[in-house]
């Protein structure tokens, strides 16, 4: 169920950019440069990705912290307080770690990765546009996530406005497999290595 103080989704400006996986970083940098962005949560599906994205944002000179299950309770509380007090501008979080976040003044929710559970999308974006304030929810969707996007639109009974790019018709088996691979919060390293080796071999054969 959605948190009691979550914003009704009709009041949130929702949009999606269709991008390749390797274009997401550049698009995120572009979004973070928006002068209207005062306080934002960037969502990822995995802890590893949250750390990577947080490092990228910090290198841009933007104060940020990662919030996920590998952080101690004390570290999570400290990050939340810093976010609430305006000491950090961006929080990079996984869905599980973000549960219970209740901070006013969040202007942007950025879905660096779309959730594979459509209800999580509603939970994510409901943290912006509170108390009549403006709020934007922007999603970056690569070909492997288009199924997730369709499920989300089915749930909210609405099409999300396309801000850039076009959906790919090439939702290949490998893309879908890649999307499923990301469902686990922290894929085991050896599985990930096997997965990469398998695709390198397939690419070599196809070349």
Q: Which residue stretches match the model-derived regions?
A:
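Conserved helicase RecA-like core
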Residues: 1-171
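Basic Arg/Gly/Lys-rich low-complexity intrinsically disordered segments
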Residues: 85, 153-207
């Amino acid at each position: 169920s959605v948190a009691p103080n979550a914003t009704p989704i009709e009041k949130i400006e929702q949009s999606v950019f269709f991008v390749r996986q390797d274009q997401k970083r550049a698009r995120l940098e572009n979004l973070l440069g928006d002068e209207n962005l005062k306080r934002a949560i960037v969502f990822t599906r995995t802890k590893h990705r949250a750390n990577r994205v947080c490092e990228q944002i910090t290198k841009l000179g933007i104060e940020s912290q990662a919030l996920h299950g590998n952080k101690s309770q004390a570290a999570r509380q400290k990050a939340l307080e810093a976010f609430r007090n305006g000491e950090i501008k961006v929080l990079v979080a996984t869905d599980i770690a973000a549960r219970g976040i209740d901070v006013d003044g969040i202007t942007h929710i950025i879905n660096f990765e779309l959730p594979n559970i459509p209800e999580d999308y509603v939970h994510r974006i409901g943290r912006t546009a509170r108390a009549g304030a403006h709020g934007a929810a922007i999603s970056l969707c690569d070909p492997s996530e288009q199924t997730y996007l369709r499920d989300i639109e089915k749930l909210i009974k609405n099409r999300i406005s396309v801000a850039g790019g076009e959906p790919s018709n090439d939702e290949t088996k490998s893309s879908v497999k890649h999307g499923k691979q990301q469902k686990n919060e922290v894929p085991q390293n050896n599985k990930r290595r096997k997965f990469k080796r398998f695709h390198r071999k397939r690419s070599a054969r196809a070349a």
